[in-house]
């Protein structure tokens, strides 16, 4: 009983104000960071976006004669619009959207100041010369399409048979003929069937063959000379050494001729007997 009373008295003393030593508490980095000095605020700089005016608008302004003074102003960059999305003018419900707008909004939009745009192109632009009446007519004409012609060339439309009388192979119109026939020559096949006689044709063909044969022989014998007239290229001259041909004396040639003649005479005198 005495021990319990002592414990109770010690608990009461601690409650009354007796200081009890406790280990120091660790402080988190998050709380300690708040005690550090506050950094200086970051200075934000304003960015000016410059938009270049297209040449078409400048040319239109020059035509009207209005004095245009380009000024620099802060312009926000407009987001680029993809070519897939059509503008509101081409939509069917564009008229209804415009009709739903209040007149107050329209007046506020019209009263908004126009933004001046910086452009490096001068205002005084020389306009292109005016087109003549003939040029205007030619520009308005539709360009001819050759898609059908290409398709018919790839297909069997330009095939013809020589036995067919109603064939119009020399024109550009396709002919519905079988695939087994040969391709038309657009009228140049008449040049193949010339009116020259057969004798003259044979002579001309023989002459041309001889010419081609002679040209081939010359090409094989004579090597092709490089072209020295190339701008910016310096070709080094090739030094060709001449082959030294051994000179034979006349006495040596006569001796060899005598030896060969003697061998031939012996061969002629030899009698070959076959059993």
Curated annotation (Swiss-Prot):
<keyword id="KW-0832">Ubl conjugation</keyword>
<feature type="region of interest" description="Disordered">
    <location>
        <begin position="1"/>
        <end position="42"/>
    </location>
</feature>
<keyword id="KW-0158">Chromosome</keyword>
<feature type="short sequence motif" description="FGF motif">
    <location>
        <begin position="186"/>
        <end position="188"/>
    </location>
</feature>
<feature type="compositionally biased region" description="Basic and acidic residues">
    <location>
        <begin position="1"/>
        <end position="16"/>
    </location>
</feature>
<dbReference type="GO" id="GO:0005737">
    <property type="term" value="C:cytoplasm"/>
</dbReference>
<dbReference type="InterPro" id="IPR018605">
    <property type="entry name" value="Sororin"/>
</dbReference>
<comment type="subunit">
    <text>Interacts with the APC/C complex. Interacts with the chromatin-bound cohesin complex; the interaction is indirect, occurs after DNA replication and requires acetylation of the cohesin component smc3. Interacts (via the FGF motif) with pds5a and pds5b; the interaction is direct and prevents the interaction of pds5a with wapl.</text>
</comment>
<keyword id="KW-0131">Cell cycle</keyword>
<comment type="function">
    <text>Regulator of sister chromatid cohesion in mitosis stabilizing cohesin complex association with chromatin. May antagonize the action of wapl which stimulates cohesin dissociation from chromatin. Cohesion ensures that chromosome partitioning is accurate in both meiotic and mitotic cells and plays an important role in DNA repair. Required for efficient DNA double-stranded break repair.</text>
</comment>
<feature type="region of interest" description="C-terminal Sororin domain">
    <location>
        <begin position="253"/>
        <end position="275"/>
    </location>
</feature>
<dbReference type="GO" id="GO:0000785">
    <property type="term" value="C:chromatin"/>
</dbReference>
<dbReference type="Pfam" id="PF09666">
    <property type="entry name" value="Sororin_middle"/>
</dbReference>
<feature type="compositionally biased region" description="Polar residues">
    <location>
        <begin position="93"/>
        <end position="112"/>
    </location>
</feature>
<keyword id="KW-0132">Cell division</keyword>
<dbReference type="GO" id="GO:0051301">
    <property type="term" value="P:cell division"/>
</dbReference>
<keyword id="KW-0963">Cytoplasm</keyword>
<protein>
    <recommendedName>
        <fullName>Sororin-B</fullName>
    </recommendedName>
</protein>
<dbReference type="GO" id="GO:0007064">
    <property type="term" value="P:mitotic sister chromatid cohesion"/>
</dbReference>
<feature type="region of interest" description="Disordered">
    <location>
        <begin position="63"/>
        <end position="117"/>
    </location>
</feature>
<keyword id="KW-0539">Nucleus</keyword>
<feature type="short sequence motif" description="KEN box">
    <location>
        <begin position="91"/>
        <end position="93"/>
    </location>
</feature>
<dbReference type="Pfam" id="PF25220">
    <property type="entry name" value="Sororin_C"/>
</dbReference>
<dbReference type="GO" id="GO:0007080">
    <property type="term" value="P:mitotic metaphase chromosome alignment"/>
</dbReference>
<dbReference type="GO" id="GO:0031536">
    <property type="term" value="P:positive regulation of exit from mitosis"/>
</dbReference>
<dbReference type="GO" id="GO:0006302">
    <property type="term" value="P:double-strand break repair"/>
</dbReference>
<keyword id="KW-0498">Mitosis</keyword>
<comment type="similarity">
    <text>Belongs to the sororin family.</text>
</comment>
<dbReference type="GO" id="GO:0005634">
    <property type="term" value="C:nucleus"/>
</dbReference>
<feature type="compositionally biased region" description="Polar residues">
    <location>
        <begin position="63"/>
        <end position="76"/>
    </location>
</feature>
């Amino acid at each position: 009983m005495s021990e319990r009373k002592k414990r109770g008295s010690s608990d009461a003393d601690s409650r009354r104000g007796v200081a009890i030593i406790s280990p120091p508490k660790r402080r988190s980095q998050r709380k300690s960071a708040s005690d550090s000095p506050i950094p200086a605020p970051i200075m934000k700089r304003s960015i000016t976006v410059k938009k270049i005016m297209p040449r078409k608008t400048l040319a239109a302004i020059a035509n009207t004669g209005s004095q245009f003074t380009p000024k620099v102003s802060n312009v926000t960059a407009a987001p680029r619009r993809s070519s897939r999305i059509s503008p509101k003018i081409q939509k069917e419900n564009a008229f209804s959207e415009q009709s739903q707008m209040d007149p107050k909004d329209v007046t506020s939009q019209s009263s908004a100041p126009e933004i001046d745009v910086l452009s490096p192109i001068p205002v005084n632009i020389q306009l292109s010369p005016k087109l003549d009446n003939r040029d205007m007519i030619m520009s308005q004409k539709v360009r001819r399409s050759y898609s059908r012609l290409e398709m018919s060339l790839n297909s069997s439309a330009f095939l013809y048979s020589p036995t067919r009388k109603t064939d119009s192979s020399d024109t550009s119109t396709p002919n519905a003929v079988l695939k087994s026939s040969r391709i038309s020559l657009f009228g140049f096949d008449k040049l193949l069937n010339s009116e020259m006689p057969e004798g003259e044709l044979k002579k001309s063909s023989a002459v041309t063959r001889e010419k081609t044969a002679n040209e081939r022989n010359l090409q094989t014998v004579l090597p092709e000379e490089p072209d020295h007239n190339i701008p910016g290229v310096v070709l080094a001259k090739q030094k060709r050494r001449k082959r030294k041909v051994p000179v034979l004396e006349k006495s040596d040639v006569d001796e060899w001729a005598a030896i060969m003649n003697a061998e031939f005479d012996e061969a002629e005198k030899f009698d070959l007997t076959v059993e």
